[in-house]
């Protein structure tokens, strides 16, 4: 999973993945296999990519038990579909534990509308301009505002249009989202998007809107001696 790229990195039977099974040997090797007659791909390339996933410094990967060092790892394909990993090392743990604290952080209001046919991108951009100026007229100020043309610039921003000029699209979807402290302020964006049916460019449809509370996360380090784990066993009936 999260590896396939058709024609570049093909994965057979992605709908029937066989997840890896790890065996740890006494001589500090790891042997990986997957169940026979399952899809997916287990080889040097997939194992290496997974090892490096979301690791900033392979020589210093912090865990509660050890600082892992993957910088000298070797990954080798063996016979019968096995993959061998060896060379991992460890350093003394930091003495701290990571704690992720969730807290309420306002609301996100979102509205979407589609435009299709000839000149649809220009009409979607005009609709975005209408929304922006309507918010000014209503004296609405938000801590964050985001406008996307899904299929044109939603992933890489407006700068991508300079590098990859937009093709002649037959459809595009406008998404406008805001962050607000109050729920009622976040709800405004949905009403304004819906008003584009009659007060916006021609041919809009498929309006959807939502308001969600935001749960943000702050990650902090605390001394490990402040945490006292306990284990409770319960017998089921």
Describe the residue ranges of each PLM region:
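A conserved active-site cap/scaffold subdomain adjacent to cofactor or substrate pockets
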Residues: 1-92, 100-103, 108, 112
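C-terminal non-catalytic interaction/assembly regions of soluble proteins
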Residues: 86-237
């Amino acid at each position: 999973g999260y590896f396939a790229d058709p024609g570049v990195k093909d994965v057979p039977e992605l709908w029937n993945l066989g997840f890896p099974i790890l065996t740890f040997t006494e001589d500090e090797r790891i042997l990986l296999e997957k169940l026979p007659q399952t899809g997916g791909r287990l080889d040097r390339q997939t194992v290496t990519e997974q090892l490096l996933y979301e690791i900033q410094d392979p020589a210093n990967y912090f865990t509660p038990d050890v600082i892992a060092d993957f910088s000298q790892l070797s990954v080798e394909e063996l016979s019968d579909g096995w993959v061998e990993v060896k060379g991992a090392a460890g350093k003394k743990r930091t003495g701290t534990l990571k704690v992720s604290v969730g807290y309420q952080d306002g609301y996100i209001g979102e509205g979407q509308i589609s435009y299709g046919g000839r000149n649809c991108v220009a009409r979607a951009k005009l609709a975005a301009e209408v929304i922006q100026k309507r918010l000014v007229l209503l004296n609405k100020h938000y801590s964050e505002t985001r406008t996307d043309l899904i299929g044109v610039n939603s992933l890489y921003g407006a700068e991508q249009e300079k590098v990859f000029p937009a093709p002649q699209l037959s459809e595009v979807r406008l998404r406008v989202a805001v962050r607000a402290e109050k729920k009622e302020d976040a709800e405004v964006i949905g009403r304004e998007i819906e008003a584009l049916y009659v007060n916006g460019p021609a041919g809009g449809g498929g309006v959807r809107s939502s308001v969600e509370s935001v749960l943000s996360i702050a990650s902090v380090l605390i001394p490990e001696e402040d945490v006292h784990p306990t284990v409770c066993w319960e017998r089921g009936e």
